[in-house]
C-alpha cells in the first residue's frame, strides 16, 4: 500500500489521476493526513493539457479557439474556489470526518481493494445526486450556475468552479461515512473531481463503446448546452450509467450552444461567483405568499408560480444558430498585459497551495489577499470598468511591497529585476491613467 512519504505524485500518477486510472495499491492510505493533495498538485497537468488543447485548436481549421477574457475568468473562478481550503480543511471532508467519528457503525478496512472500489462507486453516485439537485433546487443552483456561466466549452471551463458549492455537496456523501474510512473518501472525492477536467473539450468526438459506460466529452457537452434538449441532462461524474439508470441521459445530436439560458454578460469574478444570490433574494420578495416564496428557493431555477417544479421547457429560449458569446472588443496590448499579469499571479498561487503548510499564518493571509485583489483587478480590466485603473494601480503597489519584503519571489532569481521593472512601469502607467480619468471626470462635472 501507499506509504506516508508518498505525498507528492509522480509524473505518471499525475497524468493517470486525471483519467481515474490510479490503482488501489498506490492510492490507499491509513489516515487522512497521508492522503496527497492531488488537486493542488494537478495544476501543472491542467496547464499542460490546456496548452495542448490550444495548439491542437489552432492546427485545426474548424477547431475550438480560446478567448482570453473567458479563459482568464474560468481560471480565476477555479483559483477563488480553492482559497477557502487555505484557511480550513474542505467542508466535504470535515463533515465526512465528523459523521465518521460520531456515527459510523461499520469500519471497512482502508487497505482493501473492495473498500476502494465501493468508495469509487459511492462517491460517483453521490456526485450524480448532488449534481442533479444542484440543477433542480434554486438555492443550490445559485452556486452551481458559476460552472455553467461560460459560453465556451474547453478545458479551462472545467476549472470554473463555485466557492459556495462545497457547503452543500457534503450532504450527498454523508451516508458513505457510516462505513467507509475518511482516508478512502479523501482519495476518491479528489479523483472524481479530477476526472471531470478532461471531458470539457470539443476536440474529442466519440469514444465508441466507452460512451455506454463512462461520462465522455460528448455526454458532458450536452450537459453544458442551453439547447432545450440539453436542459437537465447528463449529470454524471465518471460513470454515465447513473443517468441511464435514472432517466436523465441524452445523447449529443444538434450542435450544442453553451452557457446559461440567460447569459450573465460579465467577466468580473465576484459577479460570476455571487450575482445569482441577490437575484434569488429579489425573486423571493417579489412573489406573494409563503408557499411561493419557499418554492423560489426549493424548486428549480425555471420555476414560476403556476408552472411545474422544474419550470416549463417551452420557456427555454429557442436556439437560432445565430447566438454569439459575450466578447467585447479590447486591445491586443491589454490582452497581453492581462495574460502576463495573470501568469505571474498563477505562479504565486501555485506556490501558495503547495507550500501552505510551511508558510507562516501572516504570509498565507497576505498572499491570499493579494490573490483576491489580483483576481478582482484583472476582472475589472477585462470588463473595462471605469475604476479599473485605480484598482490596478493599488494592486501593482502591493506587488512591489510584497516582492520587496520577500513574500513574493519570481520563478527564477534572474527574473527578479525584470519583474520589478515591469511592475514599476505598470504602477506608473496606471497612476497616470487614474489621474487622467479623475481629471476627465471633474471636467465633465464642471
From Swiss-Prot:
Compartmental location: Endoplasmic reticulum membrane
GO MF annotations in UniProt: glyceryl-ether monooxygenase activity; iron ion binding
GO biological process: ether lipid metabolic process; lipid biosynthetic process; membrane lipid metabolic process
Protein topology in the membrane: Multi-pass membrane protein
Domain of life: Eukaryota
Keyword Glycoprotein belongs to the record: no
Motif (Histidine box-1): 131-135
Protein name listed in UniProt: Alkylglycerol monooxygenase
Annotated source species: Danio rerio (Zebrafish)
Gene that encodes the chain: agmo
Amino acid at each position: 500500500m501507499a506509504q506516508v512519504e508518498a505525498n507528492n505524485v509522480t509524473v505518471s500518477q499525475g497524468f493517470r489521476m486525471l483519467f481515474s486510472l490510479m490503482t488501489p495499491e498506490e492510492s490507499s492510505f491509513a489516515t487522512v493526513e497521508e492522503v496527497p493533495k492531488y488537486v493542488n498538485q494537478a495544476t501543472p497537468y491542467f496547464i499542460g493539457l490546456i496548452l495542448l488543447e490550444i495548439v491542437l485548436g489552432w492546427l485545426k481549421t474548424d477547431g475550438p479557439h480560446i478567448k482570453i477574457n473567458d479563459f482568464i475568468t474560468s481560471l480565476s473562478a477555479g483559483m477563488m474556489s480553492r482559497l477557502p481550503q487555505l484557511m480550513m480543511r474542505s467542508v466535504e471532508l470535515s463533515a465526512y470526518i465528523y459523521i465518521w467519528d460520531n456515527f459510523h457503525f461499520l469500519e471497512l478496512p482502508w487497505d482493501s481493494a473492495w473498500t476502494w472500489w465501493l468508495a469509487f462507486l459511492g462517491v460517483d453516485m453521490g456526485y450524480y445526486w448532488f449534481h442533479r439537485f444542484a440543477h433542480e433546487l434554486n438555492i443550490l443552483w445559485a452556486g452551481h450556475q458559476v460552472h455553467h456561466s461560460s459560453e465556451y466549452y474547453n478545458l479551462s471551463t472545467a476549472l470554473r468552479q463555485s466557492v459556495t458549492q462545497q457547503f452543500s455537496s457534503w450532504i450527498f456523501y454523508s451516508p458513505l461515512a457510516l462505513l467507509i474510512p475518511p482516508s478512502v473518501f479523501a482519495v476518491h472525492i479528489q479523483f472524481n473531481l479530477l476526472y471531470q477536467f478532461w471531458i470539457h473539450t470539443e476536440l474529442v468526438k466519440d469514444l465508441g463503446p466507452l460512451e455506454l459506460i463512462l461520462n465522455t466529452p460528448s455526454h458532458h457537452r450536452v450537459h453544458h448546452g442551453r439547447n432545450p434538449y440539453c436542459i437537465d441532462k447528463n449529470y454524471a461524474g465518471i460513470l454515465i450509467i447513473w443517468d441511464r439508470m435514472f432517466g436523465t441521459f441524452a445523447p449529443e445530436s444538434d450542435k450544442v450552444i453553451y452557457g446559461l439560458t440567460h447569459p450573465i454578460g460579465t467577466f468580473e469574478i465576484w459577479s460570476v461567483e455571487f450575482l445569482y444570490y441577490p437575484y434569488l433574494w429579489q425573486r423571493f420578495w417579489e412573489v406573494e405568499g409563503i408557499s411561493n416564496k419557499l418554492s423560489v428557493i426549493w424548486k428549480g431555477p425555471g420555476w414560476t408560480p403556476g408552472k411545474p417544479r422544474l419550470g416549463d421547457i417551452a420557456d427555454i429560449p429557442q436556439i437560432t444558430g445565430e447566438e454569439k458569446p459575450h466578447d467585447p472588443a479590447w486591445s491586443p496590448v491589454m490582452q497581453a498585459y492581462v495574460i502576463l499579469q495573470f501568469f505571474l499571479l498563477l505562479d504565486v498561487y501555485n506556490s501558495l497551495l503547495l507550500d501552505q503548510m510551511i508558510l507562516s499564518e501572516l504570509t498565507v493571509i497576505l498572499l491570499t489577499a493579494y490573490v483576491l485583489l489580483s483576481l478582482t483587478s484583472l476582472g475589472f480590466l477585462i470588463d473595462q470598468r471605469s475604476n479599473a485603473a485605480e484598482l490596478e494601480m493599488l494592486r501593482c503597489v502591493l506587488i512591489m511591497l510584497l516582492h520587496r519584503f520577500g513574500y513574493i519571489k519570481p520563478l527564477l532569481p534572474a527574473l527578479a529585476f525584470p519583474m520589478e521593472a515591469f511592475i514599476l512601469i505598470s504602477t506608473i502607467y496606471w497612476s497616470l491613467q487614474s489621474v487622467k480619468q479623475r481629471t476627465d471626470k471633474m471636467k465633465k462635472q464642471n
